[in-house]
Curated annotation (Swiss-Prot):
Name used for this protein in its record: Transmembrane protein 168
Keyword list, A-Z: Glycoprotein, Membrane, Nucleus, Transmembrane, Transmembrane helix
Function: Plays a key role in maintaining the cardiac electrical stability by modulating cell surface expression of SCN5A. May play a role i the modulation of anxiety behavior by regulating GABAergic neuronal system in the nucleus accumbens.
Annotated glycan sites: N111, N533, N598
Biological source species: Pongo abelii
Cell location: Nucleus membrane
Length: 697
């Protein structure tokens, strides 16, 4: 007995000590990474101090000594605020501002007369060491998972260091100082572009780096110091392109959730930047050396640029108008689990963004052409403005590109509930006994509430929820379904998904039992769908809570030319009443809606003993379905709705771009593999891409 107790005690002690060692190892690793960051910062501080000391020693400029001593004094105050008053934010802000300012001084003070000095060489090596340590620290932090990514455009550290660097540039002449300040703004735009993972962020980074070699940009006298400043700021957003796990709307949250006035002002600000760039480009007309090339080129491409950027600004304005509508819904239903993603999808934002992506691409193309035609290698202000405009338009293109790819399509739903549970031998509904009326009414009301909750949760536009105790005639149902199947979005195109829900009596073959002895076959419903859908690539999802839904599930698998799915239920008829209640209509709806509207549900469709099982089937081409891409007519309608008539000639160019399909071979192979998977290995859970899933037991 004592041996057993001793063994248990020693085993528990061993486990505790092992866990303590693991925790200590994790803490030590985290501390090591932090110390590596401190080392990089201290190394940079030593390099700055040594560099400023060399400049004071060689030039005997007393102002450098004053600034140097003041800088050390400020850093001392920052340390006191941090360690003695626990004012971390104020301390770090002050130190970052001065780091940027002192590093800027190190960049812009002339060192041509003592480039080969030993202390100057030591400063360069210290700066290079700081670059290596900074990159290593950022990389290890991300590999070890110690970085918690938060949605932001510019961090406080980046902003303050950029401001400090810009202030340091005021030691130069006004024109040179303005060029550097604009270059700092361009660097800030590039950082935001990288952090947002814009589609063209990497090409922008390459262009920015290449253009820094132009002496007209007044890049500093000390290129090593400027490289240190540039790389230390770029490292984090560049690495986050791979390591950041934020979704599209999370990354763009500081912009998408901004107030209406701020977002409108951002469009005005963008327009002012574009106009300034155009005016600076026009300075090229003063070059009389190549007037025969410059004047015609600027006239032609300048007009093209103006038309494209009128469209660009109108597109941004229209985007914010639609986003304001989404905000109204979002703030009205904040307690109803509604996210901005689903609201934007339901408002047709995806279709708008796909068209806008092409239009903004024209703006980028026009800017690149105008920049090439009016290239001014000796004008630093022009080059800095060019580097500001490129990331600005790249961010707009990236926003539309990513929203167009990640947002779900529009959807509309229609529900029919016919509460009947008792039928005559010929299959027609009969009157219910009085004792069952209240129970059936409660169950039918529960089904209606559940399906309405489903529509509201997934932001599905509701055409109607019909509840009829006497049944629907064939003509009435035909007219209602006809109106439902021809519904369109506010912008004009058809909805991407049409969801039809039915709960009521069915025959053994799956046909819906209607009033007056009529029935509705699946073939008839498919013919109505073909008539209304035409060549458009919408899809139809039929949800059945009935006793005989399996025949429709099997029959839909034979359809070749449409995107149709049937989600049905199987009610187990042989149930031990002592163990469980017999299944009834409405039980499947309750479970299916809970499964799709509550992420923390405990519903398992494959568990044994379920009295209500799920089954679904899809048409043969279901896996080929993609959300509707803008056609030529869609682009033309969008153009007529949002843009002036003078811009209509660009419709043909937009249509041509829509028609490009450069990867058709890869897409064909991928489509065949998906068809094979859906026909042979039908998944237990099928994501529809609209936020809800089809399931089978």
């Amino acid at each position: 007995m004592c041996k057993s107790l001793r063994y248990c005690f020693s085993h528990c002690l061993y486990l505790a000590m092992t866990r303590l060692e693991e925790v200590n190892r994790e803490v030590n690793m985290h501390s090591s990474v932090r110390y590596l960051g401190y080392l990089a910062r201290i190394n940079l501080l030593v390099a700055i101090c040594l560099g400023l000391y060399v400049r004071w020693e060689k030039t005997a400029n007393s102002l450098i000594l004053v600034i140097f001593i003041l800088g050390l004094f400020v850093l001392g105050i920052a340390s006191i605020l941090y360690y003695y008053f626990s004012m971390e934010a104020a301390s770090l802000s002050l130190s970052n501002l001065w780091f940027g300012f002192l590093l800027g001084l190190l960049c812009f003070l002339d060192n041509s007369s003592f480039k080969n000095d030993v202390k100057e060489e030591s400063t360069k090596y210290l700066l290079l060491t700081s670059i290596v340590l900074r990159i290593l620290c950022s990389l290890v932090e991300r590999i070890s998972g110690y970085v918690r990514h938060r949605p932001t455009l510019l961090t406080t550290v980046e902003f303050l260091e950029l401001v400090g660097f810009a202030i340091a540039s005021t030691t130069m002449l006004v024109e040179k100082s303005l060029s550097v300040i604009l270059l700092v703004v361009a660097l800030a735009m590039l950082i935001i572009d990288l952090r947002m993972k814009s589609f063209l962020a990497i090409p922008n980074l390459v262009i920015f780096t290449v253009l820094l070699f132009f002496s007209s940009l007044e890049t500093p006298k000390n290129p090593i110091a400027f490289a240190c400043f540039f790389i230390c700021l770029i490292t984090d957003p560049f690495l986050d392109i791979y390591f950041s796990g934020l979704s599209v709307t999370e990354r763009w949250k500081p912009f998408l959730y901004r107030g209406r006035i701020c977002r409108r002002l951002s469009v005005v600000f963008a327009g002012m930047i574009e106009l300034t760039f155009f005016i600076l480009s026009a300075f090229k007309l003063r070059d009389t050396h190549l007037w025969y090339f410059v004047i015609p080129g600027f006239s032609i491409f300048g007009i093209f640029w103006m038309i494209c950027h009128i469209i660009f600004l109108l597109t941004l304005w229209g985007f914010h108008t639609k986003l304001n509508d989404c905000h109204k819904v979002y703030f009205t239903h904040r307690t109803d689990y509604s996210s901005l993603d689903r609201i934007m999808a339901s408002k047709g934002m995806r279709h708008f963004c796909l068209i806008s992506e092409q239009l903004v691409f024209f703006s980028l193309l026009a800017t690149a052409i105008l920049g090439a035609v009016s290239w001014q290698p000796t004008n630093g202000i022009f080059l800095s403005m060019f580097l500001i405009v490129l990331p600005l338009e790249s961010m707009a293109h990236g926003l539309f590109h990513e929203l167009g790819n990640c947002l779900g399509g529009t959807s509309v739903g229609y529900a029919i509930v016919i509460p009947t549970n008792f039928c005559s031998p010929d299959g027609q509904p009969t009157l219910l006994p009085p004792e069952h009326v209240q129970e059936l009414n409660l169950r039918s009301t529960g089904m209606l509430n559940a399906i309405q909750r489903f529509f509201a949760y997934h932001m599905i536009e509701t055409y109607g929820c019909d509840y009829s105790t006497s049944g629907l005639s064939f003509d009435t149902l035909h007219s209602k379904l006809k109106a439902f199947l021809e519904l369109r979005t506010v912008d004009g195109p058809r909805h991407d998904t049409y969801i039809l829900y039915y709960s009521g009596h069915t025959h053994g073959t799956g046909e819906w039992a209607l009033a007056g002895g009529d029935t509705l076959r699946l073939d008839t419903l498919i013919e109505w769908w073909r008539e209304k859908n035409g060549s458009f690539c919408s899809r139809l999802i039929i949800v059945l809570d009935s006793e005989n839904s399996t025949p429709w599930v099997k029959e839909v698998r034979k359809i070749n030319d449409q995107y149709i799915a049937v989600q049905g239920a199987e009610l187990i008829k042989t149930v031990d009443i002592e163990e469980a209640d017999p299944p009834q209509l409405g039980d499947f709806t309750k479970d299916w809606v809970e499964y799709n509207c509550n992420s923390s549900n405990n519903i398992c469709w494959t568990e044994k003993g379920r009295t209500v099982k799920a089954v679904y089937g899809v048409s043969k081409r279901w896996s080929d379905y993609t959300l509707h891409l803008p056609t030529g007519s869609d682009v033309a309608k969008h153009w007529m709705l949002h843009f002036p008539r003078i811009t209509y000639p660009l419709v043909h160019l937009a249509n041509w771009l829509c028609g490009l399909n450069l990867f058709w071979i890869c897409k064909t192979c991928f489509r065949c593999l998906k068809r094979l998977k859906m026909s042979w290995f039908l998944p237990t859970v099928l994501d529809t891409g609209q936020g809800f899933k089809l399931v089978k037991s």
